[in-house]
């Protein structure tokens, strides 16, 4: 697999969009601090620029490099990450304003999919990762679907299997109370008890 990860890293370093499996759906990825690639990602997705992308990391301890998290949420983070959980948190100054749409809030996820984790560890930098689909369309569940949707707009596709096909649950932990933003495979009640 290292060969495909190297190809993915080369593409990312050249401001290109890659695709890879997560445990939920296939995702598209660019380096979080590459504005040129970010703009290309918006074009590929045909997405309005008012919805921030999730930032994917390879390990829990990396969250604290990019976000400020209230200690009371650490138990939930350590129990459910990696996994189908996206947390909305206050970003640190090293996260570019265009990533958060100047809100100072970023969605962070650590996937549990083997290929996704290996890729993230290999490239050694967070990726902005929306689902692999055009705006308002169904996300790709296989590498073949990624190619059918995007053709040569995606330079490297990492092959692998998704697990569920259901997008991650999103919770907002920027304030004193945990808030549900989007339902997902993990019941909110399980997180918020």
For each feature predicted by the language model, list its residue ranges.
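Active-site-adjacent structural elements in enzyme catalytic cores
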Residues: 1-193
């Amino acid at each position: 697999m290292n060969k495909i990860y190297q190809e993915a890293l080369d593409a990312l370093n050249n401001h290109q969009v890659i695709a890879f499996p997560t445990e939920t759906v296939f995702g598209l990825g660019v380096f979080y601090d590459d504005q040129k690639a970010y703009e290309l990602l918006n074009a590929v997705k045909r997405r309005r620029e008012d919805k921030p992308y999730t930032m994917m990391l390879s390990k829990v301890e990396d969250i604290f490099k990019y976000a400020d998290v209230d200690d009371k949420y650490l138990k939930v983070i350590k129990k459910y990450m990696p996994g189908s959980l996206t947390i909305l948190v206050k970003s640190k100054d090293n996260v570019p304003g265009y990533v958060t749409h100047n809100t100072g809030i970023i969605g962070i996820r650590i996937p549990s999919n083997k290929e996704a984790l290996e890729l993230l560890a290999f490239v050694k930098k967070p990726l902005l990762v929306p689902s692999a689909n055009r705006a308002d369309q169904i996300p790709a569940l296989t590498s073949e679907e990624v190619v059918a949707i995007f053709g040569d707009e995606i330079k490297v596709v990492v092959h692998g299997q998704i697990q569920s096909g259901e997008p991650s649950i999103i919770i907002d932990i920027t304030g004193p109370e945990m808030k549900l933003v989007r339902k997902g495979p993990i019941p909110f009640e399980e997180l918020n008890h």
